Structures are given as C-alpha cells and as structure tokens.
Regions:
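Short, surface-exposed loop/helix-turn segments at secondary-structure junctions
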Residues: 74-99
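Short helix-loop capping/hinge segments that flank enzyme active sites or metal/cofactor-binding pockets
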Residues: 10-55, 71-72, 76-79, 112, ...
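Structural helix-boundary/capping segments
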Residues: 41, 52, 95-97, 102, ...
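Single conserved hydrophobic/aromatic residue that forms the stacking wall/gate
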Residues: 1-9, 13
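Short, high-confidence coil segments that cap the C-terminus of an alpha-helix
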Residues: 61-62
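A conditional alpha-helix N-cap/helix-loop micro-motif detector
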Residues: 2, 44-47, 95
Length: 163
C-alpha cells in the first residue's frame, strides 16, 4: 500500500463516519475529495450544462467584467488551520473560503480569466477586476485587459515588489 492509497482509504473511512448534519469546512472537503463516481458524474453533468449556458452567453457578449474577490487585497491570515481563518467583508467577519467564489465563477466552467490591477486602495494594496472570456478565448481576455490598461495606466507595483 502506498501513502496515497492509505490516505485515500483513511479519507473514505472519515467520510463514512461523518454526521449527516456536519457542514464544517473539513467535512465538506472530506466529502468532496471522496466522491463516488456517480456523485462526480452528477456534478460534472451540472458543470456541462453550465458550460453550455456560458457558450450561449458569449454568442452575444465578448467578455464579463467581475470582481477578483469579495474584498480588496489584504494582509493574509497565516493561521495553519484554514477553516479558522477569517476576513472582513464590509466590516463583517466572513469565512476565508468565501474568497474563492469569484475565482470559481470562471474556473468551474473552464473559462479563461485575466486579472487586471485597476489601482491601489486606501491601504496601498492593489485593487483589480477579472476579465472572463469564452472557453478557449484566452487571447481575447488578455487583449481586452491590455486595452483597458492602456486607458487606465494606473498599475504601480507595491514598493516591496517593484523591480
């Protein structure tokens, strides 16, 4: 038995012993990494339908402009227990995993996304938007980002990262 197969067997055991009303981050992670094939297939079917909806959407629109995350850049919480990490959104403490919604918007459907810095917040950290395009249209999102950047011309690397 290899380490990975031992780990997988351990995760399956953990999943089988989860309480049905346990929706903690660890329980969700355990369930999502030990999907039965039929569960994965059902989820993939939903993803395929979503991909077709995006395909129809992009017949009429070139790109989608969306936030990169629910908050501007911030100093990262280094707590090793990710499930305990928190961030502030509009003054309210939220689970750290809320950050992944906007990235997931494009990733779940295999859509390209190019992030464009649009300036600096009051704390001096970058603010940006993402340009989402149709599947296989990476060059279109990159070109759109270049056109916006030519007009805004606002990106300045933070001092510690300037070369």
């Amino acid at each position: 038995s290899t380490l990975s197969s031992s780990s997988a067997a351990s995760d399956v055991y953990k999943r089988q012993n989860l309480d049905s009303d346990d929706f903690s981050d660890l329980a969700r992670l355990t369930r999502n990494t030990t999907l039965l094939h039929r569960e994965w297939f059902t989820a993939n079917e939903r993803r395929t339908k979503l991909r077709w909806e995006w395909h129809e959407f992009f017949k009429e629109y070139d790109v989608v402009l969306a936030p990169v995350a629910s908050v501007c850049a911030f100093p990262h919480d280094q707590n090793p227990k990710i499930s305990e990490r928190l961030l502030k959104v509009n003054g309210e403490k939220r689970p750290y995993n809320d950050l992944f919604f906007w990235a997931g918007l494009s990733c779940v459907s295999y859509l390209p996304s190019t992030v464009l810095p649009t300036g600096l917040g009051n704390d001096g950290l970058p603010i940006g938007i993402q340009v989402i395009g149709a599947e296989m249209q990476d060059l279109k999102t990159i070109r759109f980002e270049q056109l916006i950047d030519e007009q805004l011309n606002v990106f300045v690397p933070p001092e510690k990262y300037a070369v």
